[in-house]
Amino acid sequence: MIERKKIEVTGTVAGKKVIFQSGFLALQANGAVLARFGDTVALSTVLMSSEPKLDIDFFPLTVDYEEKSYAVGKIPGGFFKKEGRPTDMEILKARLIDRSIRPMFPDGMRNEVQVLNMILAADMENPPDIVALNGTAAALAVSDIPIPELIAGVRVGYIDGEYVLNPTFAEMSESQLDLVVAGTRDSIVMIEAGAAEVDKSILIGGLKFAQEGIRQIIDLIAELKEKVGRPKAEITVVSFPQEQLDFMRNHEDRFRAALITPIKQERERAVSELKKALFQEMLEVFPDLDEAMFNLMFGEVEKEVVRAYMKSTRKRVDGRAFDEIRPLYAESSVLPKVHGSGLFIRGQTQVLSTVTLGSFSDVQFIDAIGLEEFKRFMHQYDFPPFSTGEVKPRRGPSRREIGHGALVERALSYLIPSEEVFPYTIRVVSEVLESNGSTSMASTCASSIALMSAGVPMARHVGGIAMGLIEYNDENVVLTDIQGLEDHLGDMDFKVAGTREGITALQLDVKVKGISVETLDKAIDQAEVARSKILDVLYDAIPSPRPLSETAPRIVKIEIPVDKIGEVIGPGGRNVKRITQETGATIDIREDGVAFVKGLTDESVNMAKQQVEMIVKDPEVGEELTARVVRVTPSYAIVEIAPGKTGLLHVSEVSETRIRSLEDVLSVGQTIKVWVKEKDGEGRLRFSAKEKKSEAH
């Protein structure tokens, strides 16, 4: 019989109660932990296949993250009333966890590992991604999966000059910094950050502050691991047959000849030809040669050759110095008709970005734990197969594309003007036309150009660069502007984006077991020099935002008192429909009374705005207005000063001379000048068309 026993550790991190519990739930998983920060609870499970897949050349890790609607007391929307495919937010949080734990698995491991995080309860204060990240770290620690080193993760905010560990949702709304860091006791393995143009010193200080919090959580996880006391499993890892590896290493000169070339296509062609030839040569010597093993050994020798070449020549495979950027090119407004466009080229990486401006009806509604908002700035990243010269099926955006799109969006979001300044919904799409490293940072640059091309009043350009790292024996070499080969064979992909004023986004992925803050400090310094050069090119392409395109809609924002919303809309939407018919402009009204008037011309928008303002306005006695006759009888007329806003005009108030019948002097549709003579307690109006008499002095 399975023994169920709650094994629990409790501590306090950032003034909040933290609990890790194991041994009672989900016991058929290799490891399962119920993690609780405050009243936000995640069940994190990890599973490992019993047998490795030795015929593949990668580590088969899958990470999923699910936010359950019941966690916040909601029933899912839609016809089926149940959770469906993961949202973009869930995918991004799954990637956050994946990137944190992937470097920690043993080299050569080929057992399938699946990580599943379910958010079971949420207090709307403590962000669940940090709970799930640490739940995963704890589940791996108590499992039999052979990860030798413990990790943990924290979020750091920066409010009023002070760092805040694991801030609440409310605190994050006030923070200049949203920094998520995962790491071991002494090194960092993952960073995801957005920042309001902060100085490098704030980020470096945030990383050091994060490490203190990480150690606190690791102490709790270590205590739980000791209490559970489960030994680690013995697994089979891929190891190279030494004789075959030595044979391949004897052909390092051929590797060098194929790899050392500045043109990506030429290099790939030469490497492909070498691979085919070497495989046939080795088959003759080693008849039992396994193709998957050959591919792994080939990649290992590639890595060794590239690193040795850099070490000995102090140059990179394309001839650049370690801190040298590839040739840059930027151009604005490259497409007709679209609201804005920008092209950015760095070496053999090329991105075309476009901007489309819309109204409030075009916003995206985000409904996630701790976040319900109308998202008015969206960036989407598209990576077609032709960008790498490959033939692949197209099946919608991949997790990678969603992740890259979000990174660019975060880098730009701090420069997007507020709704009060620019009442538009903004959609940016980045099309990767060529890829040879750091397409996300090229997308940031192209998007910055496109936004200014569209007339979005951004204060400054945003540029980005990807930094790499090569660890070779006792030396760490930081590389500026890594290309695809250096990303593939290197130890770090560190993306840094920002303006001339400061940093707006960071993203770090590593392939080693961690990187020191000192190395990252050096990389940020090197990135700032490169970013300055890139920004010069962006400003040369378009120094400031252009006027709105003629093809872009015209939008103005109006504040409507909440108690007047029904009056503006009218019965069955009659008033709004009529304004649209008469002016050609459309009106979107939010529940809080904020309205957006959208039209193709300034004239139509202003006409619609004036009509809305007249509906909302309470005319004062004596105020002169223009009215339209909507009904005429012999003794009185009904006149309208705005759609749905009418009053009475008596026959005696039309002329100083006697009129037998109003039907003789007025007709429906006629426009006349009137003034407010009376207004009763219910707001009903009586007008006069007589000339106003001057008050006696």
From Swiss-Prot:
Primary localisation category: cytoplasm
MF-aspect GO terms: 3'-5'-RNA exonuclease activity; magnesium ion binding; polyribonucleotide nucleotidyltransferase activity; RNA binding
Catalysed reactions, as listed in the record: RNA(n+1) + phosphate = RNA(n) + a ribonucleoside 5'-diphosphate
Keyword RNA-binding: yes
Cofactor(s) named in the record: Mg(2+)
Protein's GO biological process: mRNA catabolic process; RNA processing
Localisation: Cytoplasm
InterPro entries found in the cross-reference section: ExoRNase_PH_dom1, ExoRNase_PH_dom2, ExoRNase_PH_dom2_sf, KH_dom, KH_dom_type_1, KH_dom_type_1_sf, NA-bd_OB-fold, PNPase
Functional description taken from the UniProt entry: Involved in mRNA degradation. Catalyzes the phosphorolysis of single-stranded polyribonucleotides processively in the 3'- to 5'-direction.
NCBIfam families assigned to the protein according to its UniProt record, in alphabetical order: polynuc_phos, PRK11824.1
Name the UniProt record assigns to this protein: Polyribonucleotide nucleotidyltransferase
Organism annotation: Coprothermobacter proteolyticus (strain ATCC 35245 / DSM 5265 / OCM 4 / BT)
